[in-house]
Amino acid sequence: MMEEELLIPEDEYQKSGIHIGTQIKSKDMDPYIFKIRNDGLYILDIRKTNHALIIAGKMLARYRPEQILAVAQRQYAFRPVSKFSEVVGSKSIIGRFIPGTLTNPALPNYSEAKIILVTDPLADTQAMKEAIKVGIPIIAMCDANNKTDFVDLIIPTNNKGRRSLAVIYWLLAREILKNRGDIKSYDEFKQTIDDFEVQI
């Protein structure tokens, strides 16, 4: 089997800390662990992250932009998610996910999303519960400690880091536009990773 080409050089992935997991590992995430460091941190497999991003890009490109809902409760994900939504034209909810958003058509903020992109299954539990209830596919950024029940596509990544979240959402936006045919090559993607990163 040929090795899949990386979307960005391996050292760029490493610099962003995308592969730095947690000191606690769930059984669900076993297949995505590359190694355990001397300090007890689980390291995620960059090639599996890369592969998941390629699959997610193809999958999300099949949906109309307004059918995609990206959610984030984590503060470091606010900027990446809002920028991602702006670039790909999707809907987004940052901060508190109001109960009933996916299940109660009477709510003014009701969403008829056909697929949901979750930044952290642990933090975004309300969004997860509702997506499961209405039966829409779930793509989730999963760290070493996450449980992955009901997740249709796992993107193994550091879902807590400022830079790692920026890189993940930047790459995903670029993949979606390329798969849609909105850009013919990566050179045409003018946004930078910095555009997606929360500034402190």
Swiss-Prot record:
Keywords from the named record: Ribonucleoprotein, Ribosomal protein
InterPro entries: Ribosomal_uS2, Ribosomal_uS2_arc, Ribosomal_uS2_euk/arc, Ribosomal_uS2_flav_dom_sf
Ribosomal protein recorded as keyword: yes
Any one annotated GO CC term: small ribosomal subunit
Source taxon at top rank: Archaea
The keyword Zinc is assigned to this record: no
A single BP term in Gene Ontology: translation
GO molecular function, one term: structural constituent of ribosome
Family label: Belongs to the universal ribosomal protein uS2 family.
Protein name listed in UniProt: Small ribosomal subunit protein uS2
